[in-house]
Design a protein with these regions (language model features):
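Glycine-rich loops and low-complexity Gly/Arg-rich segments
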Residues: 3, 36, 45-49, 70, ...
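Short alpha-helix boundary/capping motifs
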Residues: 37-39, 86-88, 136, 149
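Secondary-structure boundary/capping signal
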Residues: 17-19, 68, 116, 156
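Gram-negative outer-membrane beta-barrel transporters
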Residues: 26-28, 46-131
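Membrane-embedded beta-barrel scaffold of Gram-negative outer-membrane proteins
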Residues: 2-66, 75-83, 161, 166, ...
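Conserved C-terminal beta-signal and adjacent last beta-strands/turns
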Residues: 7, 63, 95-177
Length: 177
């Protein structure tokens, strides 16, 4: 079986009409199940021995006036093999494929409780390794989105009609490997 040991410490602070959060964490896993090979729609798995994920998360949720809101989050994550999982070479210390080291998100919008609302957001993911040997990787990417909608009450029901455009500038990116 796969087992985990996790340690996390965090803090939250109210700043005016906002909330700032921060956390440090570390998870050590024994016998983690990871992808061995994936081809033609078929995927096989293997046990990776020991792995470690350690990092930090920062978040901000800030309200301006009655209806303007800014949200932001950043994660730094170091996910590595602690034992060798490769056949011919040593992969100990290599990054685990498919996991970005840095991920960020920010949004800003007009969000009243009722009526029209609108906002935009931006998402970032740093490069991700595509194999255990760390010889191939998918590049980092950034995409922008827009949201708009209308909120109202109909009897006892709250209604929300909305539309969203993801990847506004039609960027090509690899979402997974």
């Amino acid at each position: 079986p796969s087992t985990n040991e996790t340690v996390e410490i965090g803090s939250k602070a109210r700043i005016g009409n906002g909330l700032l959060t921060a956390a440090l964490f570390q998870t050590d896993t024994d016998n983690e199940i990871v992808v061995d090979a994936s081809s033609g729609g078929r995927t096989s798995y293997k046990n990776a021995g020991k792995t470690r994920r350690q990092g930090m998360e920062l978040g901000l949720d800030q309200q301006f006036g009655e209806s303007w809101r800014l949200k932001a989050a950043w994660t730094w994550l170091d996910a590595t093999y602690r034992t060798n999982v490769c056949d011919d070479t040593s992969c100990k210390g290599n990054r685990i494929p498919g996991i970005a080291r840095n991920m960020g998100y920010a949004s800003f919008g007009y969000q009243p409780e009722k009526g029209w609302y609108a906002g935009s957001d931006i998402r970032y993911m740093s490069d991700i390794m595509a194999n255990d040997e760390n010889t191939a990787k998918a590049p980092s990417w950034t995409v922008v989105g827009l949201t708009t909608g209308y909120k109202w009450s109909y009897g006892k029901m709250d209604m929300d009609l909305f539309g969203r455009v993801d990847n506004l500038f039609d960027r090509s990116y690899a979402g997974s490997v």
